[in-house]
Design a protein with these regions (language model features):
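Short amphipathic alpha-helical segments with heptad-repeat character
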Residues: 27-41, 67-70, 74, 119-122, ...
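Conserved alpha-helical segments that form or flank metal/cofactor-binding pockets of metalloenzymes
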Residues: 55-96, 167
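A structural signal for well-ordered alpha-helices, especially hydrophobic packing surfaces
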Residues: 37, 44, 51, 70, ...
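Acidic/histidine-rich alpha-helical segments that form the ligand environment
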Residues: 82, 96-155
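Acidic, low-complexity proline/glycine-rich segments
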Residues: 1-19
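Helix-loop segments that flank and shape redox-cofactor active sites
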Residues: 20-28, 43-68, 131-145
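Short, contiguous alpha-helical
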Residues: 149-179
């Protein structure tokens, strides 16, 4: 028999946190980190999904490029979960919680060509990095340790984003995904460019 579905606990102020911060600040930082944990968990699953569903002439290059990114992003998730626990809160990593708390839709491509997936991943990485930068701004004053963690992760995410974009850039420095705001529109733009 399946477990009965229960309401998800709301994040509360922890009973303790790290020295030099109030429990209220610890709870607020933990909430910011939970959002980032959700995003990174979603990202590493999305990267693995693309790894399994990429097809076409660039298959092997993209397939092999993604596994190290999956591993690194999964490790980033672990660091954030452990920081949440260090702050006295309880990290939540269940699929239902992630889906309930996220502010974005599921990755929208299934089996598709390498270039289409790379175009869609450009949009995905842009969103994750923009939100990580916002989290840096929110955490810096009360918690420079968390800020440093997020800065280091942002640097690694930006490197991975460059790996993706290098496939989408022409010699003049123009991205095939310029002005695309959705995964599907980015995939469509890259498909048009790759057929020329």
């Amino acid at each position: 028999m399946a477990a009965k579905k229960t309401a998800q606990r709301k994040s509360t102020t922890p009973s303790y946190t790290v020295p030099g911060m109030t429990t209220k600040e610890g709870g607020e930082i933990a909430a910011v980190l939970q959002d980032r944990l959700n995003a990174l968990t979603d990202l590493h699953l999305t990267l693995k999904h693309v790894h399994w569903n990429v097809v076409g002439p660039q298959f092997i290059a993209v397939h092999e490029m993604l596994d190290p990114q999956v591993d690194a992003v999964r490790a980033m998730s672990d660091v954030l979960a452990e920081r949440i626990a260090t702050l006295g809160a309880s990290p939540v990593g269940t699929p239902g919680s992630l889906v309930a708390q996220r502010s974005w839709d599921d990755y929208s491509l299934g089996r598709a060509g390498a270039i289409e997936h790379l175009g869609a991943l450009d949009v995905v990485y842009t969103g994750v990095i923009e939100d990580h930068r916002e989290a840096i701004e929110k955490t810096g004053d009360p918690d420079p340790v968390t800020e440093d963690i997020l800065i280091a992760q942002s640097g690694q995410l930006e490197l991975f984003h460059w790996f993706i974009r290098a496939h989408l850039e022409d010699p003049g420095g123009h991205l095939a995904t310029a002005s695309a705001s959705t995964e599907r529109s980015a995939a469509a733009k890259t498909a048009r460019v790759s057929t020329r």
